[in-house]
Amino acid sequence: MSEEAKKRIQLALALAVVVAGVRAGYILYQRHEEYLAAQKLEQAKRAGYSNPDYYVQPKKLYPYDLKSARQLTQQPVWVKEGYRYTYYAYDPARKRTDFAHEAGLLLPIERLEIKDVVTAFPPGADQRRQLMAVFQKEGKSYAVPIGFEPVGEFKIYSDEMFYVEDPHDLYKHWPADIWQAIEQHQVKPGMNEMQADFAVGMGVPDAGRSDEKTVRYPNGGKPLVVTYQGGKAIEIKAGS
């Protein structure tokens, strides 16, 4: 066997060891996260929390590379925080994301069908490679960042962005009038913060007292200010 062939075999074996190590690390991480979720649920039960939301454990995919991130194509996803994530026009023929022009923001609890997960480099020599989820909207293709590659290893945050189970099923214990307000993108007195997030997207809390909380919602250009007391909305007014 030639020296070149030996080097190729050694390189292939080394690569296989690295891949196996990454996979093993991912499995351990996934099991650790599942263990923490189970512990959190058990603690909630022991504390006797009456809020059923504490017992909801949304499924996570724990993606760690391009291949595992493509699990997003296997089921619909729903946006967790509306008006937070910017998406861009995507050319599927050229596999190119138009980072120069923002196409919009993902909406609250918007349902998406992820068609593919690809990589892309934004303009600029110092920009890091981005991981993009490709979807269609009104017949056009778009891509939204779901992670990046700082130094040879992806940091993927799609589990923080999307539900992979229908929120209507996860939170089926919510009353029908709450879901109706959410679908109409309205915040009503008595809603909790999660329900308000579902209705009008991400909010930014003010610093203040622990027993009373004020949260400001950009709401896609129609700002709202909501005051919560005891975890429930007591005042809703237009923001500025």
PLM feature segments, named:
Residues 133-171:
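Boundary regions of SH3-family modules and the immediately adjacent low-complexity/disordered segments
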Residues 47-49, 121-141:
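Basic/aromatic-rich interaction segments and small domains that mediate binding to polyanionic partners
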Residues 97-123:
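Conserved beta-strand/loop element in small beta-rich adapter and peptidoglycan-binding domains
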Residues 10-27:
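Hydrophobic membrane-insertion alpha-helices, especially the h-region
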Residues 1-7:
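Short, Lys/Arg-rich N-terminal segment immediately upstream of the first membrane anchor
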Residues 37-97, 161:
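SH3-family beta-barrel domains
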Residues 24-36:
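Hydrophobic single-pass membrane-insertion segments
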Residues 28-31, 120, 126-128, 172-240:
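A cross-family detector of function-defining hotspots
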